[in-house]
């Protein structure tokens, strides 16, 4: 990949909803650019809101998280065009990183598992357990921590389809020995160049401290989950929080791999 100017497309899947993810992604790219001493051009496409789709001439693509059901939009035009784009990206081997809602849509479209509602909504700073070694996880522990905010999950992996695509499950959600429920899939390597995660690796410690202490956010979590849940979340956001390690490594590792065109480890 040419390093003069690296063109990055961000597919905005927020559908106009307030979020901190977009700015966090831009901050990661800016910090990475400065560290690598490269130039980047970042273009945002309002995919869900306006049906905007990037051309195939970008060097890499990041598709954001977003609200709502990944099952209810199958017949919507933006969703149809988005899944066509996913298939095209696999064919032309462009680096793609899918976050949360984007990951769920990809799993649904490629039939890699069952996409369904969780028994209850998940929110918090929670452990992710890796299953394989991969350059994406460089700098992270075998179990690392990430922000989760989701009502949906992917379970019951379709092993035949995974094998057919040469895709691989990379991580599962936290172990819950006391809960007789299947652990959800947290990351998949769809191909040599396409990765997807169920969590939010773009979340920075500083932004999360502000977000979870905002009166509206605090009240919403307390009303839905209770005071103890909110307190547990903010307790994870101290100076030694492992969330910053995830922020500093995972998406930058994807950018490094895209820049260097490194082979699968």
Model-derived regions: residue spans:
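Pocket-forming structural segment of enzyme catalytic cores
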Residues: 108-206
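A structural signal for short, well-ordered beta-strand segments and their strand-loop junctions
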Residues: 10, 44, 97-100, 148, ...
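Glycine-rich, phosphate-binding/catalytic loops in enzymes
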Residues: 25-28, 77-81, 113-116, 164-165, ...
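Short catalytic/ligand-binding loop motif for oxyanion handling, primarily in non-cytosolic enzymes
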Residues: 17-18, 51, 69-72, 104-108, ...
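Cysteine-nucleophile active-site neighborhood
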Residues: 67-134, 145
């Amino acid at each position: 990949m040419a390093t003069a100017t690296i063109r990055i497309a961000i597919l905005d899947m927020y559908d106009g909803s307030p979020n901190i993810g977009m700015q966090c992604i831009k901050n990661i790219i800016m910090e990475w650019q400065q560290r690598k001493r490269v130039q980047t051009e970042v273009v945002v496409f309002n995919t869900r809101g306006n049906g905007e789709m990037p051309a195939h001439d970008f060097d890499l693509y990041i598709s954001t998280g977003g609200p709502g059901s990944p099952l209810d939009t199958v017949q919507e035009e933006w969703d149809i065009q988005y899944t066509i784009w996913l298939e095209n990206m696999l064919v032309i081997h462009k680096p793609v990183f899918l976050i949360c809602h984007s990951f769920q849509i990809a799993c649904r479209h490629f039939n890699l598992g069952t996409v369904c509602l969780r028994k209850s909504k998940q929110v918090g700073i929670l452990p992710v357990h890796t299953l394989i070694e991969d350059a994406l996880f460089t700098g992270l522990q075998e179990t690392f921590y990430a922000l989760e905010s989701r009502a949906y999950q992917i379970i019951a992996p379709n092993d035949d389809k995974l094998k057919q695509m040469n895709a691989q499950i990379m991580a599962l959600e936290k172990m819950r020995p006391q809960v007789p429920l299947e652990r959800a899939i947290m990351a998949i390597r769809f191909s040599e160049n396409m990765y997807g995660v169920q969590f939010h690796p773009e979340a920075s410690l500083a932004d999360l401290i502000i977000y979870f202490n905002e009166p509206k956010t605090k009240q919403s979590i307390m009303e839905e989950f209770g005071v103890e849940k909110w307190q547990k979340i903010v307790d994870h956001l101290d100076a030694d929080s492992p969330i910053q390690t995830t922020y500093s490594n995972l998406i930058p590792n994807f950018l490094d791999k895209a820049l260097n065109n490194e082979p699968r480890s």
